[in-house]
Curated annotation (Swiss-Prot):
Its EC number is 1.8.5.-. One of its GO terms (molecular function) is oxidoreductase activity, acting on a sulfur group of donors, quinone or similar compound as acceptor. This is Protein-methionine-sulfoxide reductase catalytic subunit MsrP. Its main location: periplasm.
Length: 334
């Protein structure tokens, strides 16, 4: 596989400081304006990130053992960890980007199990200990592009999803892979209260074609910045597909099913004209209400330092993944 790492010093960026075009999407779909408004405290907190004011401390996770394959490393200074762990999209804990860090401590991950079923010869149920014993972890520095128009670069720790799927031995009927987030309203307040969770249908679900899931770039991610994922980043295990928009990166996964037909996905069900199943990063296919031709790389400087730059096809991974979509109309299959 040809390694592509089109990164510059300005590409290593913090978790987005921008609030929620998607919040606006929900509002325009007719949901409660009160649930979608940005509180003054959160707005002030947003400005403090740009001004370099007080920030929450970085989440303190368990250090992980991992290798660092050279083709996935960028010799660049990473943005402080507290920005990645303190500003997140995870609607199960609220709509504001500060909500997950504030409220995700209710998530219980100690006895986590992940089930692999469906069109497989060997269904599996694995604990996180099983996963760490069976699958060697490695750090990969990946670009991440949000559908909202911002991007960053994150040092994930994880392993190739394809290795887990191979262990389950997919049958010849398997064509797609469906993913499910934990459904636990007692732990995830957004699942219990539509006002908090934006009115999404929970649990959050996502999907990939089998060949996308088997691609070597596709990760099941267990850590960030060398430590176990904190709850707000999708602990204890999440999906990372670097050539797709960030909403494909489903968090806190409890079930992976290999299936015959294209599975439903949360944002596509909510607004199919705005969020496609494929969700490949594509500067030539705009969101119905904003351009995807450019993006904001969010750095550690002030708000005046935030500048737009061209969005790369497949988020810069075209040499590695474009062949998956040969002959497919990317405008129709967005």
């Amino acid at each position: 596989m040809k390694a592509v790492n089109p990164l510059t010093e300005n590409d290593v960026t913090p978790e987005s400081l921008f609030n929620a075009r998607r919040r606006t999407v929900l509002k325009m779909l007719g949901m409660s304006a009160a649930a979608l408004s940005l509180p003054g405290a959160a707005r002030a907190d947003l400005l403090s990130w740009f001004k370099g004011g007080d920030r929450p401390r970085a989440a303190s996770g368990r250090p992980l053992d991992f290798s660092q394959p050279q083709q996935f490393q960028a010799n660049l200074p990473l943005t402080p960890e507290d920005k990645v762990t303190g500003y997140n999209n995870f609607y199960e804990f609220g709509l504001d980007k500060a909500d997950p860090a504030a409220h995700a401590g209710t998530l219980k991950t100690a006895d986590w199990k992940i089930e692999i079923d469906g069109e497989v010869a060997k269904p599996l149920t694995l604990s996180m200990d099983d996963i760490f014993k069976r699958f060697a972890q490695e750090q990969r520095i990946y670009r991440m592009r949000c559908v909202e128009g911002w991007s960053m670069v994150v040092p994930w720790v994880g392993f190739e999803l394809g290795k887990l799927l191979q262990a389950a031995e997919p049958t010849s009927n398997a064509r797609f892979v469906a993913f499910h987030t934990l459904y636990a309203p007692d732990q995830m307040p957004g699942q219990q209260d539509r006002f908090i969770g934006g009115g999404l249908d929970y649990p959050y679900v996502e999907g990939l074609r089998l060949d996308e899931a088997m691609h070597p770039l596709t990760l099941l991610t267990t850590g960030v910045y060398g430590k176990a994922l904190p709850p707000q980043n999708g602990a204890p295990i999440r999906l990372t597909v670097p050539w797709k928009y960030g909403f494909k990166g489903i968090k806190s996964i409890v079930k992976i099913s290999l299936v015959k037909a294209m599975p439903p996905t949360t944002w596509n069900q909510l607004a199919p004209n705005e969020y496609g199943f494929y969700a490949n990063v594509n500067p030539h296919v705009d969101h119905p209400r904003w351009s995807q031709a450019t993006e904001r790389f969010i750095g550690s400087g002030g708000i005046l330092d935030v500048q737009r730059q061209p969005t790369l096809l497949f988020n810069g991974y075209a040499d590695q993944v474009a062949s998956l979509y040969r002959g497919l109309d990317l405008r129709e299959n967005f």
